[in-house]
């Protein structure tokens, strides 16, 4: 979609009716109406193998699946995982400490209607050269919620090309590996919502934005000399809302929060805070609404009519929320625990890394014990009794009165559905 004026990037890009069922309770933004595998089949991941029956790679290799887990732990992969269309990945269903996928990256290119929740994607030094930890080149309607992504060799989390209606919310985008060390590109005219995320320890592109973007209540910590939020740096036209974010300098930070904008980048900005002094206290100030404070972008007087959050936090509230809940936070692993501790040092800790060994690698996870599931339909017997389904009949994909499958109703009950 080629944009010529802001009116073209309004809710028209968010074409579903406002009454459409959202991906899960709490889904927001451009990607809120992704359907995932709701009209397909359940696939239960039963092992930590790189491939083969019962593996995560096999689970996402076909369309129209809801993926749940009867195992927890670290899945070590050699090649990139390529995700098919209309796949839901519900990492919160894993027992123990959940799921980490380590060793290479993921492609969600053309993975229309993806829903991804509560999983860790950690690429690492041994991953494919010049590739992202999580990359999307094209595709429509995707939402990533409570995902921890780190150690990309090119970008860590990037969205490019003919991609549209995508949300990344409540997630951690961390530690792109040197020498590139990039948070990621967010450059599509089709609409990307970034809500309540943590960008941390990336030298540059935290993120770099072109096209249509809603950037609300994010925390950016310890960006390097390449820049924090990079505003287009392009002859192309961009239109963004930038609201209620907090930028906190760390040991690696040597430039201001916003860089490399120009008059082609049109930004509505409101209540963004900046703490540059690295003094061990969160004591930032509101950035004045001027082009010079926002990297030279053209400042707009009216907010773009994009799908917004239900509740806009203050920047301080966003920091409190992100440090408590962002990423695959049902159980925080050792990596995310270290990253959050860096943020809470308020400028005194953190660094750019070239090898994940600096963080102790992906760590170890308690695999837990899967609950009894007699019929193998993905819902534990005890939960089926509470739902009113039959523990002896494969009925998890039947629709509940809410419009979700019974499997989704159960999985959604395992984690919070609101953030305020």
From Swiss-Prot:
Positions of glycan attachment: 49, 165, 202, 394
GO CC term, one of those recorded: extracellular region
Region Disordered, residue ranges: 358-396
Entry annotation: catalytic residues: 205
Subcellular location: Secreted
Residues spanning the signal sequence: 1-20
Annotated positions binding Ca(2+): 275, 277, 279, 281, 286
SUPFAM superfamilies xrefs: Pectin lyase-like (SSF51126)
Keywords for this protein: Calcium, Carbohydrate metabolism, Cell wall biogenesis/degradation, Glycoprotein, Lyase, Metal-binding, Polysaccharide degradation, Secreted, Signal
Cofactor: Ca(2+)
Catalytic activity: Eliminative cleavage of (1->4)-alpha-D-galacturonan to give oligosaccharides with 4-deoxy-alpha-D-galact-4-enuronosyl groups at their non-reducing ends
EC number: 4.2.2.2
InterPro entries on file: EF_Hand_1_Ca_BS, Pectin_lyas_fold, Pectin_lyase_fold/virulence, Polysaccharide_Lyase_1
Enzyme class: lyase
Protein family according to the UniProt entry: Belongs to the polysaccharide lyase 1 family.
Function according to Swiss-Prot or TrEMBL: Pectinolytic enzyme consist of four classes of enzymes: pectin lyase, polygalacturonase, pectin methylesterase and rhamnogalacturonase. Among pectinolytic enzymes, pectin lyase is the most important in depolymerization of pectin, since it cleaves internal glycosidic bonds of highly methylated pectins. Favors pectate, the anion, over pectin, the methyl ester.
Protein name: Probable pectate lyase C
Species whose genome carries this gene: Aspergillus fumigatus (strain ATCC MYA-4609 / CBS 101355 / FGSC A1100 / Af293)
């Amino acid at each position: 979609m080629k944009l010529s004026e802001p009116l073209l990037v309004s809710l028209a890009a968010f074409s579903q009716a406002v009454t459409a069922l959202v991906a899960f309770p709490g889904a927001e933004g451009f990607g809120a109406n992704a359907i995932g595998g709701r009209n397909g089949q359940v696939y239960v991941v039963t092992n930590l193998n790189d491939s083969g029956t019962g593996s995560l790679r096999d689970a996402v290799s076909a369309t129209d699946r809801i993926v749940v887990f009867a195992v927890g732990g670290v899945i070590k992969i050699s090649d990139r995982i390529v995700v098919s269309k209309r796949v839901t990945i519900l990492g919160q269903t894993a027992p123990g400490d959940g799921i980490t996928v380590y060793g290479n990256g993921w492609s969600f290119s053309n993975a229309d209607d993806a829903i991804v929740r509560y999983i860790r994607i950690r690429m690492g030094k041994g991953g494919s050269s010049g590739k992202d930890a999580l990359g999307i080149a094209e595709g429509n309607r995707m939402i990533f919620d409570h995902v921890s992504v780190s150690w990309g060799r090119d970008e860590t989390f990037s969205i490019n090309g003919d991609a549209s209606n995508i949300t990344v919310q409540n997630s951690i985008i961390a530690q792109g590996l040197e020498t590139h060390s990039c948070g990621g590109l967010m450059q599509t005219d089709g609409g990307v919502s970034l809500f309540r995320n943590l960008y941390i320890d990336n030298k540059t592109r935290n993120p770099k934005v072109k096209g249509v973007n809603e950037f609300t209540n994010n925390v950016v910590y310890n960006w390097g000399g390449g820049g924090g939020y990079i505003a287009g740096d392009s002859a192309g036209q961009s239109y963004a809302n930038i609201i209620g974010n907090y930028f906190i300098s760390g040991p690696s930070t040597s430039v201001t929060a916003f860089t490399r904008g120009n008059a082609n980048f049109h930004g509505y900005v409101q209540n963004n805070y900046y703490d540059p002094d690295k003094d061990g206290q969160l004591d930032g100030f509101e950035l004045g609404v001027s082009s010079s404070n926002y990297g030279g972008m053209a400042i707009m007087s009216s907010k773009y009519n994009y799908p917004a959050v239900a509740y806009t936090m203050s920047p301080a509230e966003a920091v409190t929320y992100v440090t408590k809940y962002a990423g695959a936070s049902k159980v925080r692993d050792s990596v995310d625990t270290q990253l959050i501790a860096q943020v809470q040092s308020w400028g005194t800790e953190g660094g750019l890394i070239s090898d994940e060994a600096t963080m102790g690698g992906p760590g170890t996870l308690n695999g837990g014990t899967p609950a009894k599931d007699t019929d193998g339909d993905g819902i534990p017997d005890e939960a089926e009794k509470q739902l009113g389904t039959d523990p002896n009949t494969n009925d998890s994909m039947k629709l509940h009165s809410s419009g979700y499958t019974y499997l989704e109703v159960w999985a959604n009950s395992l984690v919070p559905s609101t953030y305020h």
